């Protein structure tokens, strides 16, 4: 008769009391079984060496894999399994009537039993009684102290007392029509709000440059009122008929508008707007053509001598003006620069009304005069930049005045290196603490001005004239430079800058303190007429 021996504990040499569990017997075999030899003789089995890992509870594998279950079903099943909640120390399943309404309880009752079987197959430990320790449940965790006696603070943040303690989810889950719920039997985890974050999809995005700070971007948003990254069309307020509709610049450039409103645009007694040029130049040129057309009328006119004298004086002023622009263009040292600035200040004494205020317009500070009415200066500027081989340079800049706003308009010449071009005017009103960018738009090619030069003309507009340092001041200091981006023949990126020989273009912009409508002394239409782009070689 075979004999069995109780296995001994390897460490304590005491008999082990193994549980009488069929599951263990089936899985791990009967360790008390006898081993018979091939001769039919029984042989006593020595106690096997036991490993402590064998006593760990190992979950059984699934008998059949649920391959037909959809991912949505798996997600719902896992969600229901993780909804193990406790009320008054007793575990309540996720489909308890307190959590779900009574209408859906019977429908899910059968699914609950099936889920329970699958839970046993996957992990029988899922039914272990585990509760979150909280002060509300009366089981506060014991305090922990360091060796120094200092209390260790918990890194887990408790629910804020300022949050409402009755979210709508509690009322929806109770199934009760009454809004009064006894919170003593409600798990505190149900009272915690979700920490999900919602991002608005319509928020504008502001791109930061390398040297910009968030406070600078905030100032720009205040000044601009809104963030708008789309290119603004080049338009002007219709000051011709007294309306407030926007009129494109292309319509103002047409010859019909120039001829129709030519007489109105020439009525300006003051006449000084751009860089100290006089509005009477065009009127005198008109008289010059009349003198050349009919010589007999001049001889018979009693005022013919006065007209000739005025014409001679105007020609002398034009020659002096051209020499002054050439001197500014050819500055090579500081002494000449200081001398030029002194002469410019003396010659610009007529720009002041009284003793303190200057007339509306643009006043250059460190670069020559670029007015579309002084065609000799424009012509000289173009040839000088072409002789230096510059692929991009400022051709002219002027101020358009209207009834309610003012816009700075400029033209840029660029070398036609590649078809794809991007010209950006980067400007600032506060000495580069913040800056803005205005993208230029294509205007025309330069064959009408410089045939065979392979140049294109782009135009830009700056319409946010302001003084960030003093909002009550009518003088703003503009500083800008021009960036030219294109591609080379080898598809390499090309970048060029026109920054006035590393000094940037600096301009004082003088605007009216208040512009509520047209005035009798200054006609804004005159400025609009003479600020249009023209060919300086005609």
UniProtKB/Swiss-Prot annotation:
InterPro entries noted in UniProt: CBM21_dom, CBM21_dom_sf, Gip2/Pig2, PP1_regulatory_subunit_3
Domain of life: Eukaryota
PROSITE patterns: CBM21 (PS51159)
Single GO cellular component term: cytoplasm
Key word Signal present: no
Biological process per Gene Ontology, one example term: regulation of glycogen biosynthetic process
GO MF terms held by the record: glycogen binding; protein phosphatase 1 binding; protein phosphatase regulator activity
Function: Interacts with glycogen synthase 2 (GSY2); possibly also interacts with phosphatase 1 (GLC7).
Name of the protein in question: GSY2-interacting protein PIG2
Species of origin: Saccharomyces cerevisiae (strain ATCC 204508 / S288c)
Occurrences of domain CBM21 (ranges): 384-508
Keyword entries, A-Z: Phosphoprotein
Modification Phosphoserine occurs at: 162, 196, 296, 304
Other remarks on this protein: Present with 996 molecules/cell in log phase SD medium.
Lineage: Eukaryota, Fungi, Dikarya, Ascomycota, Saccharomycotina
């Amino acid at each position: 008769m075979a004999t069995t021996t109780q296995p001994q504990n390897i460490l304590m040499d005491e008999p082990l009391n193994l549980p009488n569990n069929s599951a263990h017997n089936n899985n791990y075999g009967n360790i008390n079984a006898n081993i018979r030899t091939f001769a039919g003789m029984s042989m006593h089995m020595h106690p096997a060496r036991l490993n402590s890992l064998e006593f760990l509870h190992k979950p059984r594998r699934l008998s059949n894999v649920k391959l037909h279950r959809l991912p949505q079903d798996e997600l719902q099943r896992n969600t229901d399994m993780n909804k193990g909640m406790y009320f008054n120390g007793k575990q309540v399943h996720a489909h308890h009537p307190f959590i779900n309404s009574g209408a859906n309880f019977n429908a899910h009752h059968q699914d609950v039993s099936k889920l329970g079987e699958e839970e046993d197959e996957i992990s029988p430990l899922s039914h272990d009684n585990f509760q979150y320790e909280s002060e509300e449940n009366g089981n506060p965790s014991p305090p922990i102290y360091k060796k120094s006696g200092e209390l260790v603070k918990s890194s887990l943040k408790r629910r804020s007392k300022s949050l409402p303690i009755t979210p709508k989810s509690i009322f929806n889950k109770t199934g009760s029509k009454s809004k009064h719920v006894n919170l003593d039997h409600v798990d505190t985890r149900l009272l915690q709000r979700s920490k999900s974050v919602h991002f608005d999809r319509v928020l504008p995005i502001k791109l930061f440059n390398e040297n910009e700070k968030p406070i600078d971007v905030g100032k720009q948003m205040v000044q601009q009122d809104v963030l708008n990254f789309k290119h603004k069309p080049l338009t002007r307020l219709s000051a011709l008929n007294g309306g407030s509709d926007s009129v494109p610049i292309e319509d103002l450039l047409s010859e019909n508008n120039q001829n129709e409103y030519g007489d109105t645009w020439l009525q300006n007694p003051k006449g000084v707007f751009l860089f100290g040029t006089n509005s009477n130049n065009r009127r005198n040129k008109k008289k010059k053509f009349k003198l050349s057309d009919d010589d007999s009328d001049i001889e018979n006119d009693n005022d013919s001598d006065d007209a000739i004298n005025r014409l001679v004086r105007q020609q002398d002023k034009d020659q002096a003006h051209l020499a002054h622009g050439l001197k500014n263009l050819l500055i090579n040292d500081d002494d000449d620069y200081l001398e030029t600035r002194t002469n410019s200040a003396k010659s610009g004494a007529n720009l002041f009304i009284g003793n303190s205020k200057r007339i509306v317009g643009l006043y250059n500070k460190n670069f020559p005069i670029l007015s579309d009415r002084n065609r000799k200066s424009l012509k000289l500027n173009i040839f000088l930049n072409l002789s230096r081989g510059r692929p991009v340079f400022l051709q002219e800049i002027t101020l358009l005045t209207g009834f309610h706003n003012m816009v700075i308009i400029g033209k840029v010449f660029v070398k036609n290196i590649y078809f794809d071009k991007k010209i950006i005017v980067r400007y600032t009103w506060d000495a580069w603490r913040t800056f803005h960018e205005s993208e230029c738009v294509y205007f025309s090619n330069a064959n009408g001005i410089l045939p065979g030069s392979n140049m294109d003309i782009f135009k830009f507009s700056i319409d946010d004239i302001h003084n960030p340092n003093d909002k009550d001041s009518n003088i703003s200091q503009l500083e800008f430079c021009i960036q030219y981006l294109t591609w080379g023949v080898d598809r390499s990126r090309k970048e060029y800058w026109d920054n006035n020989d590393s000094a940037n273009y600096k301009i004082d912009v003088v605007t009216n303190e208040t512009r509520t409508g047209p005035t009798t002394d200054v006609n804004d239409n005159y400025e609009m007429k003479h600020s249009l782009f023209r060919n300086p070689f005609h």
